[in-house]
Amino acid sequence: MEDYFTGSFFDKPKDPLHFSAIRISISSPEKIRERSFGEVKKPETINYRTFKPERDGLFCAKIFGPTKDYECNCGKYKRMKHRGIICEKCGVEVIPSKVRRERLGHIDLATPVAHIWFLKSLPSRIGNLLDITLKDLERVLYFEAFAITDPGTTPLKFCEVLSEDKFLKAQEEYGIDAFEGGMGAEAVRKCLQALELDELAVQLRMEMMESTSEAKRKKVAKRLKVVEAFKQSGNKPEWMILECIPVLPPELRPLVPLDGGRFATSDLNDLYRRVINRNNRLKRLCELQAPEVIIRNEKRMLQEAVDALFDNGRRGRAIAGPNKRPLKSLSDMLKGKSGRFRQNLLGKRVDYSGRSVIVVGPELKLHQCGLPKKMALELFKPFIYNKLEERGYVTTIKSAKKMVEKERPEVWDVLEEVIREHPVMLNRAPTLHRLGIQAFEPVLIEGKAIQLHPLVCTAFNADFDGDQMAVHLPLSIESQVETRVLMMSTNNILSPAHGKPIIVPSQDMVLGTYYMTRERIGAKGERTTFASPEEVRIAFDHGEVDMQARVKVRMIDAPDNPDEKPQLVDTTVGRIILREVLPPQVPFSAINKVMNKKELSNLIDTCYRLAGNKETVILADRLKETGFRYANLAGISICIDDMVIPEGKQAIIDRANEEVQEIQNQYTEGLITDGERYNKVIDIWAKSTEEIAKEMLGNLSKEIVVDSDGKEVEIPSFNAIHMMADSGARGSAQQIRQLAGMRGLMAKPSGEIIETPITANFREGLTVLQYFISTHGARKGLADTALKTANSGYLTRRLVDVAQDAIITEDDCGTLDGLTVSSLTEGGEVIEHIGDRILGRVALDDIHDPITDEILVEANQEIDENLVKKIEDAGLEKVKMRSVLTCQSKRGICAKCYGRDLARGHIVNMGEAVGVIAAQSIGEPGTQLTMRTFHIGGTASRAAEQTSLEARYEGLVKYINLHTVVNAEGFHIVMSRNGEVAVVDETGRERERYGVVYGAKLKIAPEGSVKAGETLAEWDPYTMPILTEVGGRVKFGDIIEGVTMEEKLDDVTGLSRKEIVETKDSDKRPRIAIKDAGESGGTIGRYYLPVGAIINVTEDAVICGGDIIAKIPRETTKTKDITGGLPRVAELFEARKPKDFAVITEIDGKVNFGKDSKGKRKVVVTPELGEPKEYLIPKGKHISVHEGDYVRAGEPLMDGSSNPHDILRVLGVKELAKYLVDEVQEVYRLQGVKINDKHIEVIVRQMLRRVRIKEVGDTNLLIDDQVERYVFEEENAKAFAEGKRPATAEPLLLGITKASLSTESFISAASFQETTKVLTQAAIEGKVDALRGLKENVIMGRLIPAGTGIPRYRHLRLHVEEQTGEQAVTQLDAAPDLDAEQQAA
């Protein structure tokens, strides 16, 4: 270290230290003194007259080094020639002043003090080791009680805590010398020194083996963990008590003189000053042999001063400065957003950057951006100076500077040259995914705004209403190469989130291409036949045919396919003109249709697959130009008459009003409850809104015209509003409905829907009341957006943190395990086809055609678009794929299990940081997810209230594990929960399958035939019925008015209903028994009623099987938490237990009800072999299974959401992953956001990395300990090799926050959350951070081990083979001539 300082000022800078890992541990007092450059004895800082540091003070030059470079404090030695000399007068070494940033001092304490992190960071480590509660420990340390350090021969225990009275009593009783005790940190230190860790560890392991109580075992395990940590790390427990304190280098806690003789100082100086003052006072008191009380008080104050220095506010009130705000302690310097980690180490401000407003640059090519000259001049300054010197315009930097300031013409020429092919990076905040920073080649422009290419707006989420963007300049050659190859906008055509193009024409461009490719009946030149596309163009340019005329053209579909014969194609003139922008590889059929936004996206996708990246970029740019041009020529505009209000609107509204009145009457008569009435009213209005919208859209989208034969035909309309929405350029059906239909139902800020809808639309105008209702929802939306952004950002941060070390580390892990992927269906409808789910994955085994048995896909082959088509054509329902979840790589993930890199369209490269990409892909759409999924107009709630099932196909009806009862009307009533109805065609192939709910009425008997569109089943969506399976006479049991049942009077209707209420008496179980109606009168059925059930029968009534005896109103059955949007995603990733989660069965078997115990229902599941299992279900919860039902493992026994931890325990990792992926996807699908499954799988993999040890066997693991899966496997492998008993463990699901905090790397965890806790634990364990993840490397200032920085590439060096000039020339001549476009690209 020495020569580093004294080395010449002009030497080349030394290489930075090379290190491969970093360790953290507790410093011993010797270590602290050894590292220190001297003791700070005085609290003084600077002499305020001379501004020189005081000797032995906090800024002492003798200890910390000189304040001026190469100059001692008294000025005897100045300048370089004396370097390394120590001045004999003031004792200051003559060296550069920067050592004041790195030299530590120390303070010797007069009495030991405890380190607050090890005391108060829960669980208290000192308390754990000594087995003292934190409260008692604090009493000892703050001099309120005594601790026994050596019990001697007395019956007192080691470490026992006694109050002062008891201590004096004990001294009287046993004699003063019989035992030793004390108070304060000194006593605690003696106790810690007396610990024999090895013996203690053995003793604790024995205790664990012997103890029977779970709580005791857990307590002992916690203590053992701390003991083992100290044993293995080589830290000594007494080091947690400090004898001397290190003092931070003065430049890191500066004191800056302000004008007016005042000083601005860092809070740390105040805190150090307090410590030194109290320490010196204590030394003096000890020398004077002051009374014990005074000394004790002073020691306590010293302890408090040191506590405040390390972590102010952790104990007691925070010490405040003169301005009443708490002082910032050492811990606060590290913590939180503005702490060292997040402010300075993870994110830094950079030079060579600028920012400005953006404007659109429609004439730019995709790889360009417009950079204002002013900005370019400033950014490229050093380059310009260099070039000016090279050219000989100037000789010195100073004159170059002058020249640039005067903006001489030569400067602009040089600037043009410097800028050429030097990419710049543009960034728009917030950067939510990697496409938020992209590289462009700058084009110099006048003005002060940056020009941005319109096609990259989607990726940046930018618009031109005043957004700003930042420009950054890559300097080194390496960074320029990376910028060009990896970040250029032309290399980021596909989105990493779903693999579809993200560079897609939008708005005007879409409208232009849409208008071009529409056909109009009766246009000029209709039905003409042309010999070639060129002829069409000539005719159009001469005005002989209209753009939208339908014509026949003789042409080849794909110009690239020479074997094809020309054919007559039906098309329009506009499509032929659009064909001119296509590359030769893309067939004409790709655009021979009306091109809306979706079709354009598909076109770019097809082009990327067929013609490659370069052609796609050219196509995108040409589409942009064509789109803008023809949108301009079309001159589409909208006026108020374009909003056509449907004629039947009033009739629909009147009918709805009548229906609502009808419902109101039913409610007044007491037939339905208030909740049901509300639900039905909302439903009626939602339906009516839909009807009006349907009629209006029908009117808008069609128009009747007369064709050339004089016949009337209906064609898609040319209404401007319709065209905008239909093409996907702007607006949606929802918005048009509000313009010309009716606004519909509105929501209150609480998310409830107001039951009076707004029947007017914007064209008619709103009344004051209607306007007021609207403002409600609108303001809520604005407030939500503001809050949402922060939440979304936080979710992304947690996701990145948990997944940052998921990197592609090997090509193939060789696993034999995978996931079975099938189409995603909901209610018999296929939501996502199997093809979309397997595209870009790698097959696990060979995939065979089920009929011909030929191999479609070989094992370990990537499934591309062609193979997907093969698999779909073969009609495969399920295929086994490799997945990230089953990847066996120890660190990171293998390329085969990950599959395709979605943004590049081929198998993922080594070193790709797939974890971060996954986190960004999930977090980026987060801002779009609404806080609560209330869709104005209740379209969301319509989906839930499905009341019947219609068959989609013709065929025979089959019941699949359905248990039914035929009721009095002769219908089959469903009595089981997870039954399904299937429709099979004549060959016996199943065409569709639906789940049917309990209590549904089946309209068609088993094996009966059904036509398409016929109703299969219907049910009441607003109540959950309780049905009887048998007929007989009703008897009530424990249904006592005022105890378990209340007759509730409805204020409005005056009618009463019998409702089951909660009772204080736990023995009472309200139930309805069905007695045999015959002579015997025995009980043949018994039904327990949950709280809130409404009784539908009277006592002694005779009923039939399938009748409803009670119903539970829907409000209470909505227990499945309807947390929508972001909170739901966060809840899933945090693996929280839902509020009322359902108890699930762990085994297959038959259900019986056992005796109730403690007011809980007992459900017994009896398997065919083995022991029955019992489950207790809290009373008042509705049990969804019935006596005698057969349940499978993992099925819920009651209402409620699933608990992911239960799924993992019962059904295993794959089922859990499937559940999490499907649930997260459901939230995003509601918002129309596409995310590939594999991103969610990557995160789930990170959540499942750890296992919990159940049995330790003969390994070194601890019971209940959470360890990484591979650590557990390695330990077991060792045990097997030595013939010992292995440990057993269960998989563990950690939420993303927990998982981030428990990563191997303590640096990464500390920079995430709970910094002090993480560092405390790491120091005790003497943890070594091997710097494997991204975050810890960024913090240490190294290249990240991903992308171009992975270890395999890090040590590559380029070297140029020597070649003569002639060889070089011949090689150049041999190179093929590049055409102009290739050179441009």
From Swiss-Prot:
Pfam family, one: RNA_pol_Rpb1_3
Gene Ontology molecular functions: DNA binding; DNA-directed RNA polymerase activity; magnesium ion binding; zinc ion binding
Official protein name in the record: DNA-directed RNA polymerase subunit beta'
Alphabetical list of PANTHER family matching this protein: DNA-DIRECTED RNA POLYMERASE (PTHR19376), DNA-DIRECTED RNA POLYMERASE SUBUNIT BETA (PTHR19376:SF54)
Function according to Swiss-Prot or TrEMBL: DNA-dependent RNA polymerase catalyzes the transcription of DNA into RNA using the four ribonucleoside triphosphates as substrates.
EC number, UniProt record: 2.7.7.6
Organism of derivation: Trichlorobacter lovleyi (strain ATCC BAA-1151 / DSM 17278 / SZ) (Geobacter lovleyi)
Keywords recorded for this protein, A-Z: DNA-directed RNA polymerase, Magnesium, Metal-binding, Nucleotidyltransferase, Transcription, Transferase, Zinc
Reactions catalysed: RNA(n) + a ribonucleoside 5'-triphosphate = RNA(n+1) + diphosphate
NCBIfam families: rpoC_TIGR
Gene3D superfamilies: 1.10.132.30, 1.10.150.390, 1.10.1790.20, 1.10.40.90, 2.40.40.20, 2.40.50.100, RNA polymerase II, clamp domain, RNA polymerase Rpb1, domain 3
Any one of the GO CC terms: DNA-directed RNA polymerase complex
GO terms under biological process: DNA-templated transcription
Underlying gene: rpoC
